[in-house]
């Protein structure tokens, strides 16, 4: 992590010396002359219901926001911004406060701002004008509070590369997702079904205002996607033709400039493709700046594929002799079979483990339906059902997902998880009904009779303890950083809240190591090593500490 931060700040310093390369991008704005730029009038019906003509924004009883917008790119952008106004400003505050927490130094923040301006200098050249225009429309409703980072439009454009930049800074753990698809003999009725967890984690507050967005553009197909205020890119979505997209990060090198953000590429596929071949053709047109697996499902083809993209090459991973497809955070196609970074990802990360766990759970279920798919997404155990501890990234359900989502493309049905994570009720939407002509009532679009109940885990003592653990885990991090005294009672309580998670013993071991209580450190490091440790580097780190401790005890 440290080396990547130093690398980025070195680039930031370099960018001060060559800032002339950023002047065009700093002042660039999309061409909106062909559009009507009149700002929409919004009527506030209640504190959680807003309308503007045919467009609406409301919060349903499960806590999900539902957005319906139609029009040309500028109309969609302006109306989205106007309807989501207060949430949009709150979301940017949450995101940028996280950056401040991560980089408290004012000098380093300044360097990061310089880096972002330099790094994103070519971003606008790689985003189609229709999406630049939409982003411009939304940006008119953002706060001026963060103009020191960049002006409204440029800042909003930068945020669409947040997934990609978080991915490049992999150690930030912003990204790590699991997805699967089943069809023919593997699904009920033989029709395609897909499901995924989107583990893009900033903090709990960031995921509070999930939006199920339903967009009817003048050009392209109507579609839905799960998003957050200010985000027009697609991370999970399905269009009216029954084509779905979801994205999973893979191992990537740090490129020297931004290209097309993955979420913009997938938005283009979602809006303009109805078959797998059309999705592939769109992907071939764009240059990306990180490595990503795009799972594309198609009702017309009744199957799913992976479009694997990187800054240098692209591959299509098909499974011609199978009726299921699994994806975590590594590439599977021939083009990347000998790729050094991909092989390292498989060997050292938790990606392969989650892949095998999905294989295991799918093999236990002869035919997948939405309820079974939700159970797989919510699964917290490891291979052969071993306890991993709650929050372990080896689990499919890491208890940090922004959302879980399930698609049945032929039926045009989609299920979106309400908070928290993927544990809340999976709310069902029927795109036939949403985009139908009879939209006279201002009410939730959900098909209530098809909803999937919330996870019973929410009512358990274990879940309540996990919530307490998150608080105590943050506390122990602060105490360790400040090298303050931690009471035996605190450590005992901390470990009891999540006893199967290796982290609670590792951090206790670190404390005792700091205090030169080497026997206690040894016992805790040894206990951690008996549990399922998330990654190979994590395990090696503990083993290194244990060697040091044993030498101290000799």
Summary of predicted features, one role per range:
Residues 1-28:
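Bacterial Sec-dependent N-terminal signal peptides
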Residues 307-323:
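Extended amphipathic alpha-helical segments with heptad-repeat/coiled-coil character used for oligomerization
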Residues 3-9, 55-57, 307:
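Assembly/interface hotspot detector across virion components, adhesins/toxins, and nucleic-acid enzymes
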Residues 155-265, 402, 406, 414-416:
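Internal mixed beta-strand/loop scaffold within catalytic domains of large alpha/beta enzymes
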Residues 21-168, 270-293, 299-304, 326-554:
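C-terminus-biased signal that marks the final domain/tail of proteins
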Residues 250, 299, 310:
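Histidine- and/or cysteine-centered catalytic micro-motif in compact active-site loops
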């Amino acid at each position: 992590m440290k080396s990547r931060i130093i690398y980025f700040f070195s680039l930031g310093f370099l960018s001060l010396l060559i800032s002339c390369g950023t002047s065009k991008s700093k002042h660039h704005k999309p061409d909106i002359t062909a559009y009507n730029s009149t700002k929409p009038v919004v009527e506030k019906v209640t504190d959680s219901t807003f309308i503007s003509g045919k467009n609406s924004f409301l919060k349903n009883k499960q806590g999900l926001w539902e957005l319906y917008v139609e029009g040309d790119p500028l109309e969609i952008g302006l109306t989205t911004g106007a309807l989501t106004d207060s949430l949009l400003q709150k979301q940017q505050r949450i995101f940028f406060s996280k950056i401040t927490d991560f980089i408290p130094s004012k000098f380093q923040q300044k360097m990061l701002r310089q880096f972002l301006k330099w790094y994103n200098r070519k971003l606008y050249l790689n985003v189609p004008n229709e999406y630049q225009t939409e982003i411009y429309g939304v940006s008119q409703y953002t706060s001026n509070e963060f103009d020191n980072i960049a002006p409204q439009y440029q800042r909003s454009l930068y945020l669409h590369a947040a997934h990609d930049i978080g991915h490049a800074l992999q150690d930030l753990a912003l990204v790590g997702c699991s997805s699967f698809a089943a069809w023919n003999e593997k699904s009920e009725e033989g029709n395609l079904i897909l499901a995924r967890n989107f583990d893009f984690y900033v903090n709990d507050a960031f995921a509070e205002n999930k939006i199920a967005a339903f967009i009817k553009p003048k050009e392209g197909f109507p579609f839905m996607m799960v998003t957050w205020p200010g985000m027009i890119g697609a991370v999970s979505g399905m269009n009216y033709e029954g084509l779905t997209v979801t994205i999973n990060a893979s191992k990537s090198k740090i490129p020297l400039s931004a290209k097309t953000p993955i979420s913009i590429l997938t938005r283009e596929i979602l809006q303009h493709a109805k078959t797998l071949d059309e999705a592939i053709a769109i992907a071939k047109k764009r240059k990306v700046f990180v490595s990503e697996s795009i799972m594309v499902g198609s009702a017309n083809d009744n199957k799913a594929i992976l479009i694997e993209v990187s800054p240098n090459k692209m591959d299509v991973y098909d499974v011609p002799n199978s009726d299921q497809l699994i994806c975590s955070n590594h590439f599977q196609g021939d083009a990347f079979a000998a790729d050094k970074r991909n092989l390292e990802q498989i060997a050292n990360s938790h990606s392969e483990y989650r892949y095998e766990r999905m294989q295991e759970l799918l093999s236990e279920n002869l035919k997948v339906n939405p309820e079974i798919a939700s159970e797989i997404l919510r699964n917290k155990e490891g291979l052969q059902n071993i306890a991993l501890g709650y929050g372990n990234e080896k689990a499919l359900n890491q208890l940090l997902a922004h959302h879980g989502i399930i698609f049945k493309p032929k039926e045009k049905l989609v299920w979106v998880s309400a908070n928290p994570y993927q544990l809340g009720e999976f709310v069902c939407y029927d795109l036939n009904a949403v985009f139908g002509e009879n939209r006279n009532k201002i009410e939730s679009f959900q098909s209530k009779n098809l909803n999937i109940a919330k996870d019973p885990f929410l009512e358990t003592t274990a879940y309540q303890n996990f919530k307490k653990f998150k608080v105590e885990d943050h506390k122990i991090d602060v105490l360790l950083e400040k090298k303050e005294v931690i009471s035996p009672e605190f450590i005992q309580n901390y470990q009891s809240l999540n006893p199967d998670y290796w982290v609670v013993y590792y951090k206790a071991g670190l404390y005792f190591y700091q205090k030169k209580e080497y026997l206690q450190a040894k016992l805790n490091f040894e206990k951690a090593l008996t549990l399922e440790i998330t990654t190979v580097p994590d395990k090696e780190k503990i083993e290194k500490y244990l060697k040091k401790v044993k030498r101290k005890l000799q």
